[in-house]
């Protein structure tokens, strides 16, 4: 394997997982803060808020998992390694 392609793949894998985790991390923090605020205002809506929060957190976390899959593909099943 070309050392330049190998080095670029490692850097790209690091960027893929790093950048893929920034957005969902911020989003999860914001969603959790808003859920706690909603629970403080309306404690009787706890079940509905919790269910919606868990579903939205799962969707946000899936974006990070996609970044991990891209990083693993770049490291172990590199399409650019001729």
UniProtKB/Swiss-Prot annotation:
It is found in: Plastid, Chloroplast thylakoid membrane. The chain crosses the membrane at residues 7-27, 57-77. GO terms for molecular function: lipid binding; proton-transporting ATP synthase activity, rotational mechanism. It is a multi-pass membrane protein. Its main location: plastid. GO terms for cellular component: chloroplast thylakoid membrane; proton-transporting ATP synthase complex; proton-transporting two-sector ATPase complex, proton-transporting domain. It holds the Pfam family ATP-synt_C. PROSITE patterns: ATPASE_C. The record marks 61 as: Reversibly protonated during proton transport. Keywords: ATP synthesis, CF(0), Chloroplast, Hydrogen ion transport, Ion transport, Lipid-binding, Membrane, Plastid, Thylakoid, Transmembrane, Transmembrane helix, Transport. PANTHER family: ATP SYNTHASE LIPID-BINDING PROTEIN, MITOCHONDRIAL, ATPASE PROTEIN 9. In plastids the F-type ATPase is also known as CF(1)CF(0). F(1)F(0) ATP synthase produces ATP from ADP in the presence of a proton or sodium gradient. F-type ATPases consist of two structural domains, F(1) containing the extramembraneous catalytic core and F(0) containing the membrane proton channel, linked together by a central stalk and a peripheral stalk. During catalysis, ATP synthesis in the catalytic domain of F(1) is coupled via a rotary mechanism of the central stalk subunits to proton translocation. Key component of the F(0) channel; it plays a direct role in translocation across the membrane. A homomeric c-ring of between 10-14 subunits forms the central stalk rotor element with the F(1) delta and epsilon subunits. Belongs to the ATPase C chain family. F-type ATPases have 2 components, F(1) - the catalytic core - and F(0) - the membrane proton channel. F(1) has five subunits: alpha(3), beta(3), gamma(1), delta(1), epsilon(1). F(0) has four main subunits: a(1), b(1), b'(1) and c(10-14). The alpha and beta chains form an alternating ring which encloses part of the gamma chain. F(1) is attached to F(0) by a central stalk formed by the gamma and epsilon chains, while a peripheral stalk is formed by the delta, b and b' chains. This is ATP synthase subunit c, chloroplastic. It comes from Emiliania huxleyi.
């Amino acid at each position: 394997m070309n050392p330049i392609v190998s080095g670029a793949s490692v850097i790209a894998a690091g960027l893929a997982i790093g950048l893929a985790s920034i957005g969902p991390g911020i989003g999860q923090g914001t969603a959790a803060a808003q859920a706690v605020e909603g629970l403080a205002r309306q404690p009787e809506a706890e079940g509905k808020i919790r269910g919606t929060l868990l579903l939205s957190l799962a969707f946000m976390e899936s974006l990070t998992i996609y970044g991990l899959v891209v990083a693993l593909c770049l490291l172990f099943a590199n399409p650019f390694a001729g």
